[in-house]
Amino acid sequence: MKQITIASRESKLALWQTNFVKNRIQSELNIPCEISTMKTQGDIILDQPLNKIGGKALFMKELEVAILSNKADIAVHSLKDVPYQLPQGFCLAGFMPREDPRDAFVSNKYNSIDDLPKGAVVGTSSLRRKAQLLHYRDDLEIRDLRGNIQTRLSKLDNGDYDAIILASAGLIRLELVERITQFIPVEISLPAVGQGIVVIEALERDNDLLEKIQKLNCRESSRVATAERAFNQELKGGCHVAIGAYAELDNNQITLMAMVASSDGKKILKRKMIGDDPTKLGKLLAQEMIALGAYKILES
């Protein structure tokens, strides 16, 4: 293979992730790479909540079109932005090692969620984060917050919010860890499916490329991500519902924690299950939670 072209979004975080993959391909597979950057609809439409304009797939479509039209060979994504169902013909070819999966509390005035005064304004665009925050602190005011990490931090620094919630992984990767005031415990805010994992997307038919990319695959990331995504797929969850799932691997045993909540945080269901087959584990936990009324909670 002469060269691999990688499709990427233009944000600093997207380019960090893409360059991370590029460097691994070049150093470990000895294949030269080039990056092709592009704006996605998710980057352009910033004045509306994601769940109102089409969901997470808006961050991927242009990259997938580039692959289909032979302008790129692979695309690099944050796994938490990847819907549970990919377009026909695409697959997840490689999972990178997971960064810290927790949500980050970022504030210039307060040290933690517990320190926030009644009525404090917290920014997040995630229904999952909003629901869990309101469940923990129903006296907070949650306002929508879109844009890349730098844009969101600027809005906080300008005084638009008392605090904002971001993914710790993105701040760590951009060397902004000093902005994290509190790593939010998973008991308070269970992460999004796949949070902290960078993933490579490719065409299923490209066997030669898939075989090469597979050599970069992190087995632990792949197994925990498969469990989390199987749970999400069984529930048919997207960014229009408050769903969280986080798996940990110990030897060959996977512990999967999951949460569904009403958008106002008043109703919440949390469960945990242990198993060694990630797909089966995710499905079984979802089925258990469906039997306990998960859909009724999500619909409310």
Curated annotation (Swiss-Prot):
Additional facts recorded: The porphobilinogen subunits are added to the dipyrromethane group.
Cofactor: how bound: Binds 1 dipyrromethane group covalently.
Stated name of the protein: Porphobilinogen deaminase
Cofactor(s) needed: dipyrromethane
UniProt record, GO biological process: protoporphyrinogen IX biosynthetic process
EC number: 2.5.1.61
Pfam families: Porphobil_deam (PF01379), Porphobil_deamC (PF03900)
UniProt KW keywords: Porphyrin biosynthesis, Transferase
Biological role: Tetrapolymerization of the monopyrrole PBG into the hydroxymethylbilane pre-uroporphyrinogen in several discrete steps.
Entry keyword Glycoprotein: no
Residues modified as S-(dipyrrolylmethanemethyl)cysteine: C239
Gene3D superfamilies named among the record's database cross-references: Periplasmic binding protein-like II (3.40.190.10), Porphobilinogen deaminase, C-terminal domain (3.30.160.40)
Catalytic reaction equation(s): 4 porphobilinogen + H2O = hydroxymethylbilane + 4 NH4(+)
Pathway(s) served: Porphyrin-containing compound metabolism; protoporphyrin-IX biosynthesis; coproporphyrinogen-III from 5-aminolevulinate: step 2/4
GO CC term (a single one): cytoplasm
Description of how the protein assembles with itself and partners: Monomer.
Family the entry assigns: Belongs to the HMBS family.
NCBIfam families: hemC
GO molecular function, one term: hydroxymethylbilane synthase activity
